[in-house]
A protein has these predicted regions:
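Alpha-helical DNA-contacting segments of helix-turn-helix folds
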Residues: 53-60, 117
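Short helix-capping/turn signature of helix-turn-helix
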Residues: 46, 98-104
Length: 183
């Protein structure tokens, strides 16, 4: 298996395992086994478990950046692309739910996923403001908060909304759409 392919496979397997089980419950050996390689190869590519986590989170930030920056720049289109990315990459959803809810302290560390997503969103807000796709009457900080709240609000609340709707014995096609906004 070529090195780049092996590295990507290991990273994808780690993303899936970390999302399903939690990073603290997944060993480098488990990642290696599920990837069909040796622990030495995982260490060769990522150095340590922290290096592997950082690589996993870099992939998530890259996917977010792509969703926000490709296509029309209006808010509704950006939000739809983020939700589409979540639908296409459920392992990212699992990872974000677990890391942001189970380990908010780690997510907010200097190399944590939340810290990097906030920085990426700030960059995107600046680009959108310069291109006229975001208003300048609101602060950058407010726009970053709104952007992440719209994305994560749906991400975190969707399982509860689905469960409640199921308890009400209503057909899925009549379920109201979930939207999250700050006022």
């Amino acid at each position: 298996m070529p090195e780049a392919v092996a590295r990507e496979r290991i990273r994808l397997v780690a993303l899936d395992l970390f999302g399903r089980l939690g990073e603290d419950r997944v060993s480098m050996r488990a990642v290696a086994s599920a990837s069909g390689c040796t622990v030495g190869l995982v260490q060769h590519h990522f150095g340590s478990k922290q290096g592997l986590r950082i690589a996993v989170e870099e992939e998530i930030v890259e996917q977010f950046t792509d969703a926000l920056s490709q296509g029309p720049g209006d808010r509704a289109s950006r939000d739809a692309r983020v939700q589409e990315m979540f639908a296409q990459r459920p392992e990212i959803v699992s990872y974000l739910r677990r890391s942001l809810l189970d380990r908010p302290d780690r997510a907010s560390e200097p190399d944590g996923i939340l810290t990097r997503l906030v920085a990426m969103c700030r960059d995107q807000v600046r680009i959108m403001r310069q291109s006229g796709h975001a208003r300048t009457s609101a602060s950058e900080e407010e726009q970053v908060l709104r952007m992440l709240t719209r994305a994560f609000g749906v991400l975190f609340l969707e399982p509860m909304v689905t469960a409640v709707w199921g308890e009400l014995d209503q057909p899925d096609e009549t379920r109201p759409a979930l939207r999250v906004t700050l006022t």
